[in-house]
From Swiss-Prot:
It is a peripheral membrane protein. Pfam families: ABC_tran, TOBE_3. The gene is cysA. Part of the ABC transporter complex CysAWTP involved in sulfate/thiosulfate import. Responsible for energy coupling to the transport system. This is Sulfate/thiosulfate import ATP-binding protein CysA. One of its GO terms (cellular component) is ATP-binding cassette (ABC) transporter complex. ATP binds at residues 34-41.
């Protein structure tokens, strides 16, 4: 387990960490999620020992490491832009940490073979970093970080420099890797989908503080406040409530918007709106709407099937209703 208690870090007048306390369970993958400047990378670097806290305590596996040098914290660290040894093969890059620790040659060979198989690079061991794709280089970086069998694996936006398709593939791969090695892992990301996809738990950060910690289902379905709800995905304000676009039903008359729900349009909170634009997004369709009463813009997300049945056109009048309204705590 990693425990950070009352962590503070200031850069001049800017509070990068403002009294942060968090427990990261052993064997889990925890994502630190937040916008730029929220403090997530500073928290990760403080756990690694790369940033000295102004105040607070960092404990790893029951040991206070607050003043312990990074190389003595038993961690593996992977950055967004990984600096591989260009003159070394993939095998030698992965083996580097083991050789520095003067492990027996047979042990090094066995461990490197095992890791190359786990990360899917066993056929690339004699290649050099320049001969690998970006995704392959990051898999090599993870193998190298895991080679010394660290207690903790720290990942600072490891897939941030890669294109969307490669990132999506590596997210799936990282989740499978974690289920195989079960090392306590902390992942920094600003990508909501990435956090929801791979993490056991998510800590949402904002302005140097932790807004909420919970499972992906907790933070998405039961957000602690409006910031968490807004940051975890698109939202629309409908009749004074924040709702998800895919939780809005659209129809050409109030009864269609109500569907199977009982009650009048007024009691059910049906909103009259004008279609501004219909945007096809592959398997879903975004309907951009303008509230007829307030003039505010909001969006509804509908399936392709519903969109084809409705055949909405710009400028026509429709009715919208929230099918689910998250219960936000009173602020």
């Amino acid at each position: 387990m990693i425990t950070v208690t009352n962590a503070r870090k200031n850069y001049g007048n800017f509070a990068a960490l403002d009294d942060v306390t968090i427990e990261i369970p052993s064997g889990e993958l925890t994502a630190l999620l937040g916008p730029s400047g929220s403090g997530k990378s500073t928290l990760l670097r403080s756990i690694a020992g790369l940033e000295a806290l102004d105040d607070g305590v960092v404990v790893i596996a029951g040991k206070d490491v607050t003043r312990v040098a990074p190389q003595k914290r038993d961690i593996g660290f992977v950055f967004q832009h990984y600096a591989a040894f260009k003159h070394m093969t993939v095998r030698d890059n992965v083996a580097f940490g083991l050789k520095i620790r003067k492990r027996p040659k047979a042990e090094i060979t066995k461990r490197v073979d095992e890791l190359l198989g786990i990360v899917g690079l066993d056929g690339f061991q004699h290649r050099y970093p320049a001969q690998l794709s970006g995704g392959q280089r990051q898999r090599m970086a993870l193998a190298r970080a895991l080679a010394v069998d660290p207690q903790v694996l720290l990942l600072d936006e490891p897939f941030g420099a890669l294109d969307a398709k490669v990132r999506a593939d590596l997210r799936t791969w990282l989740r499978r890797l974690h289920e195989e090695v079960h090392v306590t892992t902390v992942l920094v990301t600003h990508d909501q989908e990435e956090a929801l996809d791979v993490a056991d738990r998510i800590a949402v950060m904002n302005k140097g503080r932790i807004e909420q910690v919970g499972t992906p289902e907790d933070v998405y379905d039961r957000p602690a406040n409006e910031f968490v709800m807004s940051f975890l995905g698109d939202v629309a304000r409908l009749n004074g409530h924040l709702v998800r676009p895919h939780d809005i039903r659209v129809g050409r008359d109030p009864s269609m918007a109500l569907a199977a729900h009982e009650g009048t349009a007024e009691s059910a909170g049906v909103t009259r709106a004008t279609v501004e634009r219909v945007v096809h997004l592959g398997f879903e369709v975004r309907v951009e709407l303008r509230n007829a009463a307030t003039g505010d813009l909001f969006s509804a997300q509908v399936t392709r099937g519903d969109a084809e049945a409705l055949r909405l056109t710009d400028g026509e009048t429709v009715y919208a209703r929230a099918t689910r309204i998250p219960e936000l705590p009173t602020q």
